[in-house]
């Protein structure tokens, strides 16, 4: 029986990447823009019910909630050619429509105020599921709504659906460009804090710095637009869910997927790689793809969607905690075995010493309704200790602002920071620093010992933290 997943799209960025994700899923399952099954979609064997359900007239509706505090992006979706795809009861835009002003505290406070309305929508979707497995949250950590309201919803889901798994697709800001959002470091740290570290079971890191680099270097797009980077994100999202929708022998539910990648609860931030990447105008530049070629390329830095400064800093010490390669296409399992052997012989992946040093591989069918130029494609989901440098950069940028006491008045206007109470900032910094320390400790052979001593010290400050994976 399919295990259903409810998707929450929060804020401008969350709704934009969510929209691209649903477009891709419709293509892969032969569903029209109106939600009707196309006449040619007769092959079956896919699980549409994981992400869609059928209305009384048999058209497919995404199990999705579209949530924002300002109307522009959602209005765009509702006026697009996909306007009849969604359940309009699952759309929430704040009455005032003024947004969160790129302020985490505003987004969090407004989330608190509208909790009842949104949780009613979530409860209705959950009640309509036969066997709900969990939730997927799409958001950005840098602005106001996706970070603040997204944080509040993560806490609310943890309270109400503590046994359900929560995975996020979290967009990290472009660190190489000057941001329009001057308080981005505050917002990022507050979101990384308890919310993504404690209230999520798995976080797929979508690093805008790396996405822009890949668009420029790999796809030869000089000035990539948001639409083009969002297209890269939808490719990752659809590929990472392919084993749930086109099930094989393993990793055909979210719990299995997450459990295979996350041996230690807090180190649940995953980086991704995808190959081959093409855009429409490159369709003629087709090369031969093999399992070995795809798996080798997935380990190359240029194909990994996390910033180069995170991957290259102290690179000799950095290690993989786990790797899952999802290979799509007509693949002979013996080729997979030979490819893994070759990668092991060449020592292309440096693993931790305290866990299984192996690349897991899940084979998945390609959608019969989407024609691709390549015979084999692959997505890598990996837990890698170098991700800590991304978090360290967030801390460093936060400290530069905090040292100057810059823009703090914007946050003091809201209850959590009233009366100049900035403990939420201090606690957030401590939690993110402890996360950095834990990833650093993972590089050592005696990490398990560190886990027993240091982790208990770190967590004693907050007795509410439950770090166990939810049971299914």
Curated annotation (Swiss-Prot):
Gene3D superfamilies xref list: Helix hairpin bin, Tubulin/FtsZ, C-terminal domain, Tubulin/FtsZ, GTPase domain
Residue pairs linked by disulfide bridges in the UniProt entry: none
Superkingdom field: Eukaryota
Keywords: Cytoplasm, Cytoskeleton, GTP-binding, Microtubule, Nucleotide-binding
Subcellular location: Cytoplasm, Cytoskeleton, Microtubule organizing center
Recorded GO MF terms: GTP binding
Family statement drawn from the similarity comment of this UniProt entry: Belongs to the tubulin family.
The name this protein goes by in its record: Tubulin gamma chain
Protein source organism: Anemia phyllitidis
Gene (UniProt): TUBG
């Amino acid at each position: 029986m399919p295990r259903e997943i409810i998707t929450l799209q929060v804020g401008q960025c969350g709704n934009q990447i969510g929209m691209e994700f649903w477009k891709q899923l419709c293509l892969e399952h032969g569903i029209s823009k109106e939600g009707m099954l196309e006449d040619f979609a007769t092959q079956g064997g896919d699980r549409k019910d994981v992400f869609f359900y059928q209305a009384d007239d048999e058209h497919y509706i995404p199990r999705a909630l579209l949530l924002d505090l300002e109307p522009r992006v959602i209005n765009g979706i509702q006026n697009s050619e996909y306007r009849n795809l969604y359940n309009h009861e699952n759309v929430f835009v704040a009455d005032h429509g003024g947004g969160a002003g790129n302020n985490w505290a505003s987004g969090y406070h407004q989330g608190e105020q509208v909790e009842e309305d949104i949780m009613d929508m979530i409860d209705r979707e959950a009640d309509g599921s036969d066997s709900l497995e969990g939730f997927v949250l799409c958001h950005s950590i840098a602005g106001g709504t996706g970070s603040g309201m997204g944080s509040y919803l993560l806490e609310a889901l943890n309270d109400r659906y503590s046994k359900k798994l929560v995975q996020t697709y979290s967009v990290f800001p472009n660190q190489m460009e000057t941001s329009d959002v001057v308080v981005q470091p505050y917002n990022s740290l507050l979101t990384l804090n308890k919310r993504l570290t404690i209230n999520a079971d798995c976080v797929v890191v979508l690093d805008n710095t790396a996405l822009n680099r890949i668009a420029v270097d790999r796809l030869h797009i000089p000035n990539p637009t948001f639409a083009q980077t969002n297209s890269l994100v939808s490719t990752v999202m659809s590929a990472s869910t392919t084993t749930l929708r086109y099930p094989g022998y393993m990793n055909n539910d979210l719990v299995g997927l997450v459990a295979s990648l996350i041996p230690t609860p807090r180190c649940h931030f995953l980086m991704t790689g995808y190959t081959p990447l093409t855009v429409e105008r490159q369709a003629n530049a087709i090369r031969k793809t093999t399992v070995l070629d795809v798996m080798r390329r997935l380990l190359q830095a240029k194909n990994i969607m996390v910033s180069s400064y995170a991957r290259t800093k102290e690179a000799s010490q950095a290690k993989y905690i786990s790797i899952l390669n999802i290979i799509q296409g007509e693949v002979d399992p013996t080729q997979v075995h030979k490819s893994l052997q070759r990668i092991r012989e060449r020592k292309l992946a440096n693993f931790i010493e305290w866990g299984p040093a192996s690349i897991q591989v899940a084979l998945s069918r390609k959608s019969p309704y989407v024609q691709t130029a390549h015979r084999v494609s692959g997505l890598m989901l990996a837990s890698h200790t170098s991700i800590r440098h991304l978090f360290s950069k967030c801390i460093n940028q936060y400290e530069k602002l905090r040292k100057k006491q810059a823009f703090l008045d914007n946050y003091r206007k809201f209850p959590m920071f009233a009366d100049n109470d900035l403990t939420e900032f201090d606690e957030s910094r401590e939690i993110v620093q402890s996360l950095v320390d834990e990833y650093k400790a993972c590089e050592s052979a005696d990490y398990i010992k560190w886990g027993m001593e240091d982790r208990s010290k770190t967590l004693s400050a907050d007795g509410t933290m439950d770090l166990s994976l939810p049971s299914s």
